[in-house]
Amino acid sequence: MPASLKATLRGYQVDGYQWLGSLEHLGLGGILADDMGLGKTLQMIAHILARVEAGDTKPTLVVCPASLVYNWTAELERFAPSLDVCAIVGAKAQRRVQIAGADEHNVVVTSYDLMRRDIDEYAEQDFARVVLDEAQYIKNPLTQVAHAAKRLPAGVRFALTGTPIENRLSELWSIFDFLMPGLLGSRESFAKRFESPVEHAEGDSAARLQTLVSPFVLRRVKEDVVADLPEKIEDTVMAQLTGEQRKLYLANQDRIAQQVQHREASEFKKDKLKVLAELTKLRQICCDPRLHYEDYKAGSAKLDTCMELVHGALDGGHRILLFSQFTGMLDIISKRLAKEDIAFLKLTGASSKESRAKMVAQFQAGEVPVFLISLKAGGVGLNLTAADVVIHYDPWWNVAAQDQATDRAHRIGQQHTVTVYKLIAKDTIEERIMQMQESKRDLVNSVLGGDGISSALFTREDVLALLGGDGR
């Protein structure tokens, strides 16, 4: 263990630290895929610090989501203050100078987007190791970010992610194509040998793939390694649409169902994006029709139900994280909270890195009782253990994204039981999304132990199932 590390690692974290060291000693990379909240960042910091104390002179490059750049620098300062750390941000000219001087630091940290823009400069450097945090950012091998990441020069490469597979096996291939190109073959051969057979549950393909990747993937879940983590209680709260809201929902549902029914499978595939946009409209009506109809004046059953949960939690002395994938819904909730004199913070993709850090500090210090967060902007990387109530206002296609958001509160450092409320509009597409999440978990479980569905994988029959059977 590095002498200057300012932390005491738990047993499983020591195992992870030693695993990283063993891989690097062999010149190999790997995926640290621990459950959210188990300290992947700390394990990697300990590994980097150990290499520096052993005489490593080349820098480490950490690439992470923009919202986590300052989180990484803060954690490095906290746990390894002896390391020289530089955040590569700011204007292009400033970044160019910082990258050219990367070897003056032990660790340099930047975001995926800036790494993509600056890849030509990074390609001229020589890093001891490259670490991709939230490595699902390169899950699509066709993106510019994925292409750029695979050009980064390094002795070894590591990936940190709680969800190495969110929706399909090709995501795992893309991460391994970054770590150790060729290990899983070409993308085409991987699809033929593993992806298609596993997704269709053919033969022993899942077991063979697990055998192939298991030496390079370390995944622990909280239930297995943290005996003292407080309980997590999950509760689905149904809201019954009534009146004008229900009329709008049924009218739109029937219209979309007729459109899909009259499309052939080939037409559906071509128009899938349009259909998914229509499904989003249905989901917005479930949340609050004002998301789609500016002149809508009637109420929202879900918003009323949500406010009942908020008041009940606050009356009990609890503190709340409230997630929605729709920033417009967070705006509507903000107005309702302000009207009822409830103090709150709001984090979206428009929030600056500095304001994110400030809001997290305020919430953790107990200054504000409610934190509204967009699922995409704040679902990963944040430590918000001051909350013991989590409300998911709307269900996302990929349940893993919701689980990641929940684990902002249910993680190491949490002292209280965490209650998670999933708000669902009864007899609507939302209820069927939940059912589909449950029915499509098996794919990832068979390889790594995870879950998720993808709207991109929807068939015509899936969409009709989402639209069909709604009670009237």
Annotate the PLM regions.
Residues 1-202, 210-472:
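ASCE P-loop NTPase motor core, strongest for the SF2 helicase catalytic module
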